[in-house]
Amino acid sequence: MEISGSRILVTGASAGIGAVLAELLAERGAQLVLWGRDPAKLDAVVERCRRSGAQVSAHSVELSDPDAAEQLAREVERDLGGVDVVVNNAASPMRRRVQQLTVDELRSTMAVNFESPARVTMAVLAGMLERDSGVIVNVSSFGGRAAIPAEAAYCASKFALCGWSESLAMDLWHTGVRVRLIIPGAIDTDIWGRPGNDPAHFSGDLEPPSTVAEGIIVAIEGERFEHYLPDMSAVAEFKTSSIDDYL
């Protein structure tokens, strides 16, 4: 899909991947609706986007409430006259061994990382189908393709998003609506320092958010369903071919 002139909703846009993506989309002439958790940071992103001449609106949203997320998505669809591209980018970490994980932590992680993206998509999908055009971008994680120690809830939510995306792509195959699944690796965002999480096991180098943001641009404009950013597909393929060795 051509980005210029497209009406694009981006969640998780107040920092990290979403903030960088918003600026790239603004530079390409998109009309943007940005959602984020931090109003001050979100306002700063909006200001930077407007310097490119983009039309931008923003909403402070808490995606742990899927009902509210769905309702706001319906309002955005109505107010814009349609959403051409939705980028479900927002995510919440949950680094906790399953022995210490609480039901509330599990429920909240699933709400932010899976249920809200699914319901936002459902809220704008009818309009896309009516126009026979649209792109749904779901930002999952390498943890949605291969398990990570002490991240059972997070991995479960991201595995769910991957499965949802694959089925969504199949169901929409004969329509003009396309689905893109993004699999980021270890990216340098605030997800590593969020309070209420145990220390991360990962200690390697982190990729800049631009690696993923630029890859999402390619995904929107291109034809390929799945995008590993950076390319870690070989590790996921090894896990699939030999799960016992991977574990």
Regions found by a protein language model. Give the residues of each.
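Conserved glycine-rich cofactor-binding loop
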Residues: 14-16
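Conserved glycine-rich Rossmann-like NAD(P)H-binding loop of the short-chain dehydrogenase/reductase
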Residues: 28-45
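The beta1-alpha1 cofactor-binding region of Rossmann-like NAD(H)/NADP(H)-dependent oxidoreductases
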Residues: 39, 60-71, 103
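Substrate-binding pocket helix/loop in short-chain dehydrogenase/reductase
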Residues: 97-98, 102-107
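Active-site helix of classical SDR
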Residues: 121, 157
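Residue(s) in the substrate-gating loop at a strand-loop-helix junction
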Residues: 141
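C-terminal helical subdomain
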Residues: 181, 197-236
